[in-house]
């Protein structure tokens, strides 16, 4: 009876010893992790890659690139000339064209225009999504007074 009860204990002890030997051995299951980490750290230093152009030449080339400012109403552009001709064909004169161009170019520069985009966006009581700011909501208003 004593031999049968000792057999599982010996098997368990042998299994534990085998597991310790596998895990703590010099190469273990996946090798010595510390040794591998140190080898990876001491790996060969990557050499500097060869490029076709010197760094100064590349910087000089890239520094010279400047994006041209886009001028919407540049009269030399063919599409602007076409818009201008269409505008005159619709019956507007050149002064009216200049006034409209100035209006659209300067539209957002003055922030105090009551009928501008700001109040249309923020004080629209009839908007489906509701007012953008609760403080600006006029309670009980069933019409949007900004449209008048």
UniProtKB/Swiss-Prot annotation:
Record's function text: Probable hormone that may attenuate cell proliferation and induce senescence of oligodendrocyte and neural precursor cells in the central nervous system. ECRG4-induced senescence is characterized by G1 arrest, RB1 dephosphorylation and accelerated CCND1 and CCND3 proteasomal degradation.
Main subcellular localisation: secreted
Chain positions listed as propeptide in the UniProt record: 32-70, 133-148
Lineage of producing organism: Eukaryota, Metazoa, Chordata, Craniata, Vertebrata
Family: Belongs to the augurin family.
Organism: Mus musculus (Mouse)
InterPro entries: Augurin
Key words, A-Z: Cell membrane, Cleavage on pair of basic residues, Cytoplasm, Membrane, Secreted, Signal
Signal peptide: 1-31
Cellular component per GO, a single term: dense core granule
An annotated GO BP: G1 to G0 transition
Tissue expr: Expressed in the intermediate lobe of pituitary, glomerular layer of adrenal cortex, choroid plexus and atrioventricular node of the heart. Expressed in the brain with high expression in the choroid plexus and the epithelial lining of the central canal and expression in the gray matter of the spinal cord (at protein level).
Protein name in UniProt: Augurin
Localization (cell): Secreted; Cytoplasm; Apical cell membrane
Family annotation (PANTHER family): AUGURIN
Gene name tied to this protein: Ecrg4
